[in-house]
Amino acid sequence: SYLVRTVQTMNETYFEQLEETLYHEELSNGLNVYILPKKGFSKTFVTFTTKYGSIDRTFVPIGEQETITVPDGIAHFLEHKMFEKEEGDVFQKFSEVGAQANAFTSFTRTAYLFSATDHLYTSTKTLLDFVQQPYFTEETVNKEKGIIGQEITMYDDLPDWRLYFGAIENMYHNHPVKIDIAGTIESIEGITA
């Protein structure tokens, strides 16, 4: 099969304690690919993870000289927006081939993922395409501000969430980890297409 031919050319690391072999290759574009075959499993999980999370608020864009600062919550906002394309919702494309898609943002990463038992090539291509080809308009960005604003309000009503971020804020006075991953209603208002 294609997977067997692929892993035969990759670097492999065997973890004796887990009795697992992890295959790795760094592509010419810098993308790291990891494959962890699981005997006896029917479902395949695929993730596309970027090293861009909620604490990554300042950076120098490729080809630029100056540092820019983006609004708090931008990584989470992008996570939401990437699933929306001009031709429709990317979730529908995954559903059409029996795959389930999702995403999450942490302090240091954003991950886009799907699980499926069939049509892995089609779903992987969909994942790679939608993550690398964003689609934004002022209208869709403004609509998303409302959706994420509701999400922020919902989490503000959860006692465990408030306790967690209260503790983080008290421990890290000057570090961006103290700010909710989704940002604030005020910060997401500063996001434009």
What spans do the regions from the language model cover?
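His/Glu-rich zincin catalytic helix
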Residues: 2-90, 187
